[in-house]
Structures are given as C-alpha cells and as structure tokens.
A protein has these predicted regions:
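Cross-family detector of peptidyl-prolyl cis-trans isomerase
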Residues: 2-142
Length: 142
C-alpha cells in the first residue's frame, strides 16, 4: 500500500506542470508580448535607433511554439537590422513590441494582422490577414 502512495506523490508535481501549460490562442486580436530574457542595457524608446536580430514565422497555433512557416530571419543572414523606433518605418507590431525593451533582452511578439501587414499581406511571403510570430533580440540602442 505504501508504494502506490509514494508513486502518486512523485507524479503530482509532473501533472501540475503539464496542466500549467496554457494552449496557444487560435486567433490573436491584440499584440502579445512574451518576455524571454530581460535585458540589462539601455531601454529602447521612440526616437532611438534600435539594432535587432529577429526571426519571423507565420503564426500557427497547431505548430510547436506557434511557429508556422518561417518567412524571414536576420539571424540566418548574419546581418542585424536597425530602424528608428516609433517612426513608422516598420509594422506597428514591431514599434510597439520593441518599445520598452532593454539592450540584451529577447521577446516573442505575436502580432495580429492589423498591427502587421493587414489584409494586403506582403507579396507571396505573408498572406493577407496573417498573424505573425517574431522572436526579437535587442542588440543595441542608439
């Protein structure tokens, strides 16, 4: 009788961890920001030029971590991307999702269509109405 009780006691923490995993939403109607690594450097604010590494996927709630088809990656090219934060030079999801990050930080952004490429999409790479998932690492703030 003692052995089953010990086995159950050992399995309870594992069951709690499994139950704690929140499923990804099927649709996203607002920007989702997931802090992966808190940076310790300068905070990015509108007006700064930010230097980032990123990888972008089409959001797919059925795929592992929501990562559907990869559409672009500065990491794969080995070439960081810089842009003036808040100047409208990138999609709104990027401006809003990078603001407040600190250099050295990493975030996962789940960007709804209205903060991405909307109903027009982007060429043959991003279809109309696509939700995007982008991992961003803030390398520098100038």
């Amino acid at each position: 009788m003692r052995m089953p009780a010990l086995l159950i006691a050992a399995l309870l923490p594992l069951l709690a961890l499994a139950a704690d995993e929140t499923p990804l939403p099927a649709t996203v109607d607002s920007l989702q920001i997931i802090e992966l690594t808190e940076g310790t450097g300068t905070e990015a604010r509108p007006g700064n030029t930010v230097v980032v590494h990123y990888t972008g996927w089409l959001y797919d709630p059925q795929a592992e971590e929501g990562k559907g088809k990869k559409f672009d990656s500065s990491v794969d090219r080995g070439s960081p991307f810089d842009f003036p934060l808040g100047a409208g030079r990138v999609i709104r999801g990027w401006d809003a999702g990078v603001a407040g990050m600190k250099a050295g930080g990493k975030r996962r952004l789940i960007i709804p269509p209205d903060m991405g490429y909307g109903q027009r999409g982007a060429g043959r790479v991003i279809p109309p109405g696509a939700t995007l998932l982008v991992d961003v690492e803030l390398l520098d703030v100038r």
